[in-house]
A protein has these predicted regions:
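Short acidic loop-to-helix transition motifs that present clustered carboxylates
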Residues: 28, 48-53, 276, 386-388, ...
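Active-site nucleophile and cofactor-binding loops and adjacent substrate-binding regions
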Residues: 23-25, 43-53, 68-75, 130-131, ...
């Protein structure tokens, strides 16, 4: 007979889980032992938060839950930042947290904690399996919540004695299976078509859920069939979906070419858009134009985001059903404007090839990366000034080729995401990018990466500061505080973990070093002294209210 921990592992196997990330402890040792007899690979991490970041990348790249296991008390509380990041950014994650035995739940005892109450604000679902009979129910409902609608993180609490109790009966493969949805209601599709067909300057605004790999073909077909111009948030689909209709990325400071097009649009069709990516008050306040929202669940209403029509259902099916109903006559001037915005973006990117000297200009780094990134390369971005330059100017080749934290803007995600991408796609290149500040948030996982035999290249844009905060403080207050950092030796740091490190001393080194690093059989760190003197240009023509 299986015990609770063994039964839970079997449920994970039935759901197709291939990796579990975590850190052991007495309350979950039964689960760790059960994994010894499972084909699921156990990845021992250096911090629980980083385990969730790795799960988040698994969820984002596969659409299925990433799974982590941690012990009670501080093991559970260390999950919070990772879980709120996953929930905010639509990534399915299942966190399993150990708990004290049932008889100790009401006592003031070692590592006693109501993990469910801690987790409720940062997850879609949080529940403890308080009996062995309820374990499959809690598991099934948790996984369904994580993967359905707008995906996110969930928490399953496992008391120690429930993990050790005998599990009665068979384990159905139906636990956790999600029910497929159909397209939006026919009547709403007709209403949406009337609004869109009446527009002369319509713009599609693609959000994070539109960039799911499973939706890529449906997005391409919709854009090809309708000919509509589109823009995207930092996490939305890039030019790969329909290059000739793509106006570029928008968000954060509302001063990009695509933002001008969004301002001029007389109808906005949002697809998989989440207000956390780009606050509607920054782009739709005071506008009387119609909005059509296409999503997997009802949108969060906002004073500046009250769509006249919501198409709620399976995103792909709704797009397929809507496309034949659209006969849009796009104003030629608006279409030319979209082309002009795209050309302006391309011209800015082209400047990068000509920028030499030291420190290295951000556009030169973007240019050199563009030369080595292949269609099967995954690029993981941390948060900082580099993420603005990369998100605006780096061209993506397919859905979720570039991973970015645009909801919570959580520091430290890039390195764990790169590790997860390499585990999922061991034969494909992986490049991650961070600042010198964000890198040290999760740099301990370099030991994990070396132990796993990971291969990826991590670029550190080094400014010895929290630069994204610095230039915003300078713009807002005319002076700075709490942003300057000390230097550290990246090459020596890499060597300490048995990895390889480089320091760029001339911009012309960067291309050859990148090519050499991508051939290495271990993790590689590249230290790039960066010239952020043009950062204030990122905020030109920006109202002060747009400075976050």
């Amino acid at each position: 007979m299986l015990n609770g921990a063994q039964a839970l592992v079997k449920m994970l196997e039935n759901h197709g889980v291939t990796h579990v990330f975590g850190i052991p402890g007495a309350k979950v040792d039964s689960l760790f032992i059960a994994l010894l007899d499972s084909p699921i690979e156990l990845v021992l991490c250096r911090h629980e938060q980083n385990a969730v970041f790795m799960d988040q990348a698994f969820g984002r790249l596969t659409g299925k839950v990433g799974v982590c296991v941690v012990t009670s008390g501080p093991g559970v509380t260390n999950l919070v930042t990772g879980l709120v990041t996953a929930t905010s950014e639509g990534d399915p994650v299942l966190a399993i947290g150990g708990e004290v035995p049932l008889d100790d739940r009401i006592k003031r005892t070692h590592q006693a904690l109501d993990g469910v109450d801690v987790m409720k604000p940062v997850t879609k679902y949080a529940q403890s399996a308080l009996t062995i009979h309820s374990l499959p129910e809690v598991f099934g409902n948790a996984v369904r919540a994580a993967e359905s609608g707008r995906p996110g993180a969930v928490f399953l609490g496992l008391p120690k004695d429930v993990g050790l109790a005998d599990f009665p009966g068979e384990i159905s493969p139906l636990w956790g299976r999600s029910a497929p949805c159909g397209p939006a209601a026919s009547s709403e599709l007709q209403r949406a078509a009337l609004l869109i067909n009446a527009a002369r300057r319509p713009l599609v605004l693609m959000g994070l859920q539109a960039s799911q790999p499973a939706s890529a073909d449906a997005i391409k077909r919709f854009l090809a069939a309708t000919g509509l111009p589109y823009a995207a948030t930092f996490q939305g689909p890039g030019g790969w979906a329909a290059a000739s209709q793509y106006a570029g990325k928008l968000g954060l400071f509302r001063n990009q070419p695509a933002d001008r097009l969004l301002d001029d649009a007389d109808c906005v069709i949002t697809v998989g858009f989440d207000p956390i990516e780009f606050d509607p008050s920054l782009w739709n306040s005071g506008k009387s134009r119609p909005l059509v929202a296409i999503d997997g669940q009802a949108i969060d209403q906002d004073q500046a985001f009250l769509p006249q029509v919501e198409l709620i259902g399976d995103l792909d099916a709704s797009l397929e059903a809507l496309a034949p109903l659209l006969q849009v006559q796009v104003e030629e001037a608006f279409r030319r404007s979209a082309d002009a915005e795209a050309a302006e973006l391309a011209a800015t990117v082209a400047e990068g090839a000509q920028l030499g000297g030291m420190p290295v200009h951000p556009l030169r780094v973007v240019h050199e990366l563009q030369q080595v990134v292949t269609p099967d390369t995954t690029v993981a971005l941390d948060v900082g000034s580099h993420y603005i330059w990369m998100s605006r100017y780096f061209a993506t080749g397919h859905a979720r080729q570039v991973l970015v934290s645009n909801g919570q803007q959580t520091l430290g995600v890039a390195l764990p995401w790169a590790m997860a991408a390499n585990l999922l796609r061991p034969d494909q290149p992986v490049i991650s990018v961070s600042g010198d500040g964000g890198f040290l948030f999760t740099a301990t996982e370099l030991e994990t990466a070396k132990r796993l035999g990971s291969r990826f290249v991590h670029l550190i844009w080094n400014s010895a500061s929290y630069d994204m905060v610095e230039f915003q403080e300078q713009a807002h207050y005319g002076r700075i505080a709490g942003v300057k950092l000390g230097h550290y030796d990246v090459e020596a740091f890499a060597a300490a973990f048995g990895c390889k490190g480089y320091r760029i001393n001339d911009a012309d080194q960067l291309g050859p070093v990148l090519r050499e690093a991508l051939q290495a059989d271990c993790p590689v760190l590249i230290d790039i002294p960066i010239d952020y003197s043009d950062n204030l240009k990122l905020m030109q023509n920006v109202h002060q209210d747009f400075i976050h």
